[in-house]
Amino acid sequence: MRRLIKSCLNRKLVIDVLIICSFCLISLIYFKPVLSGKKIKQSDIDQFSGMSRQIVEHRENFDEEPYWLDNAFLGMPTYQVAVSYPFDVLDKVDKIIRFLPRPADYLFVYLLSFFLLLKSMKVRSDYAFFGSIAFAFSTYLIIILGVGHNTKALAIGYAPLALAGFFKILNNRTLSGVVICSVGLGLQINANHYQMTYYFMMLMGLILIMSTLFEKGDNLKSKFVKTGAFSSSVLILSLIHISEPTRHSA
């Protein structure tokens, strides 16, 4: 019996790994020109390059990060433009996940993140595969890549990963849930598109409220307090992930 269970688990794991590998292939086939060194023309990225030029020049001339920019909307903090954080751990995790050439890497994040969400909901691998395809190739998610809304694409792409961990917490799989959700939410916040993060936090709040409505009596209070506590822990861990010590830190 144990051998049978182990065999089934190994078979499912192999299938899931093959599906994830197929996501790499699908992403590269869809954006085939990147294989010949071509780059997609993104209007927002052209504007970003001009806006961030002052930051690049300051970095090259003074070997330090400027934290204020004069030529963007009459002045604004550079953390919303192109500041570099040398000790950003999640940035390194993001680069590992997005190992494909741009913009195929964004499509891969869409596919992988939504696949992990569906698997956390115990959806069959074949259904999860087609569900991921439907999500990743939805019209809007492709359009925003064309115009260069890269941070928005990344914030949307990592949201299902955070949601996968959140569902695990709701289903009392707290340890794995906290780890996955904190990393996913950290990556989502680290994408630096706070509008999408704001919408996503609203979604998580609604899911938490709706999930407690199905509980009764003492279970209602217990689940709400427990889930709320773990969710708060996730948020704190996510913020710790993206916090960046500098020489100006207290």
Predicted stretch roles:
Residues 198-237:
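Perimembrane helix-loop-helix junctions
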Residues 27-117, 133-160:
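Membrane-interface coil-to-helix junctions
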Residues 155-171, 183, 203-210:
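Specific aromatic-rich, kink-prone transmembrane helix
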Residues 1-30, 218, 223-234:
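Start-transfer (signal-anchor) and selected internal transmembrane alpha helices
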Residues 240, 244-250:
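Single conserved hydrophobic/aromatic residue that forms the stacking wall/gate
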Residues 168-186, 220-229:
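Short hydrophobic alpha-helices at membrane interfaces in multi-pass membrane enzymes
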Residues 25, 178-193, 233-236:
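Membrane-interface alpha helices of multi-pass inner-membrane proteins
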Residues 118-137, 172-178:
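Transmembrane-helix signature of polytopic, membrane-embedded enzymes
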